[in-house]
Amino acid sequence: MHDSLTIALLQAREAAMSYFRPIVKRHNLTEQQWRIVRILAESPSMDFHDLAYRACILRPSLTGILTRMERDGLVLRLKPINDQRKLYISLTKEGQALYNRAQTQIEEAYRQIEAQFTAEKMQQLTHLLEEFIALGNSRQEDIPGDNE
């Protein structure tokens, strides 16, 4: 048993990434870039702040990552005419094609995990983590300060 929940969660993340990291590297992406591609593949366009939150990337870091991804032709940054303060991000056709190529390999990695850990345990773990995340999110809402 782990004495530290945060260390156990980090070690679990590393264990999971051992299945996915080689795939991400094969597609010449960083882990952060893959998170962005995966999130945007599920949403046609996303607000910059929402993307930062969902990808667990600090906004200043996200700016640099998106600049490189835009240069590589994977994403577009769009500002609405009616609100120049907003910034939306979407995948390009090339970004979507990259996601489609990688996704087959990602699904195979999930099958490997389920074969070793079982689909039932994966479902239980995911459910428990979602509950814990919701608990943490509700605590963050109670903290005074910048809650954008």
From Swiss-Prot:
Keyword line: DNA-binding, Repressor, Transcription, Transcription regulation
One function term, GO molecular function aspect: DNA-binding transcription factor activity
SMART domains: HTH_MARR
InterPro entries in the cross-refs: HpaR/FarR, HTH_MarR-typ, MarR/SlyA-like, Tscrpt_reg_MarR-type_CS, WH-like_DNA-bd_sf, WH_DNA-bd_sf
UniProt GO BP: negative regulation of DNA-templated transcription; response to stress
Location of the HTH marR-type domain: 2-134
SUPFAM superfamilies per the UniProt record, alphabetical: Winged helix' DNA-binding domain
Residue pairs linked by disulfide bridges in the UniProt entry: none
Summary of the function given for this chain in its UniProt record: Repressor for the homoprotocatechuate catabolic pathway hpc operon.
Protein name from the UniProt record: Homoprotocatechuate degradative operon repressor
Organism expressing this protein natively: Shigella flexneri
